[in-house]
Structure formats: C-alpha cells, structure tokens
A protein has these predicted regions:
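Structural/interface elements that position substrates and couple domains in central-metabolism enzymes
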Residues: 1-160
Length: 160
C-alpha cells in the first residue's frame, strides 16, 4: 500500500502510543509487512517468469501497469511501484511503465500500452480505464497484484 497515509501513519501512531506506555508491536509488524511487500512481489514475478516463460528476471522486459499509489489518480507519494521497479532493475530486468495518470516517474516516461512487446506485464495499480481482458489476450505473462483480471480465465495470469 502506498500514499501519504497508510505507510506512514502507523509509525507515528506507534511512536505516540509508546509515550503512553502502550504496546505497539502489532502496529509495527503491520508496517514491516507493508514495507516488505515489494520484495514478495518481485519473488512472485520471478516465479511467473520462470514457470510461464522459462525465463529469469535478468534480461527480461517488464511492463509495470500503474505507478500511482491508488487507482485513477496521479499521486505517486510512497507508491510501492518505486521500490518494485528498483528491485526488478537490480535483478537485471529492463523495466518500463504505463500509467494513464502519471506521465513521468522515477526518471522514466509512460510508454504506449503494448503488452505483447514485454515478457511480463505487472498490474501494480488497477486504473479503471484499462482494458484488462485485452491486455491479458496480448500479453505473454500477467502478474496481477490488484485482482484487476478477476473473471478472466487464462493460464497467463498469476495472482497473489
């Protein structure tokens, strides 16, 4: 989860609660889980690539769909896409993104929506203007972290 609220407010709440001798381990654990999700997502993408295409992340072309922190907005504050892009690049992937609401992100420009040009399409933010059935049809492998492909039956689609 991203945005200005959920990733940051639990840490403030935990800090404030400790001033009053309240235990905050559950709040801190929730923050840790949220912070570690990009690592888990990278692992799911790697598995999808290995099993779906018999290909590793290194040298693969990955298209991130949506970099805003939530659907149908242009705000990228604390977006999980930022860390995920970094992790994929570190693994050797060539990463691009398409977001109808975000023209520039992390030194990149939003590319044309051409799923067939990539080894894997990763749905990070489920913007309602995107045709997910068409994307699945044209893509090699789709990893859907937002359940945007619900109701679409395809062996190409990997979900959490």
């Amino acid at each position: 989860l991203g945005g200005h609220c959920i990733p940051l407010d639990p840490y403030y709440l935990a800090w404030k609660a400790r001033e009053y001798d309240f235990a905050t381990r559950f709040i801190e654990l929730a923050g840790e889980v949220n912070n570690n999700m990009p690592y888990f997502c990278r692992s799911v993408i790697s598995q999808a690539m290995n099993h779906g295409l018999q290909k590793s992340l290194s040298g693969s072309r990955i298209l991130i769909l949506g970099v805003a922190y939530k659907a149908d907005i242009s705000d990228t504050r604390e977006t999980p896409a930022e860390k995920l892009v970094e992790l994929l690049r570190t693994a050797g992937a060539d990463v691009a993104y398409h977001d109808p609401h975000v023209a520039e992100f992390d030194g990149m420009r939003s590319v044309a929506l051409e799923p067939e040009a990539y080894d894997c399409v990763v749905i990070v933010t489920a913007h309602t203007s995107l045709d997910y059935a068409g994307i699945v049809e044209r893509a090699n492998v789709v990893v859907d972290f937002r359940n945007a492909t619900r109701g679409i039956e395809s062996r190409k689609v990997w979900k959490l």
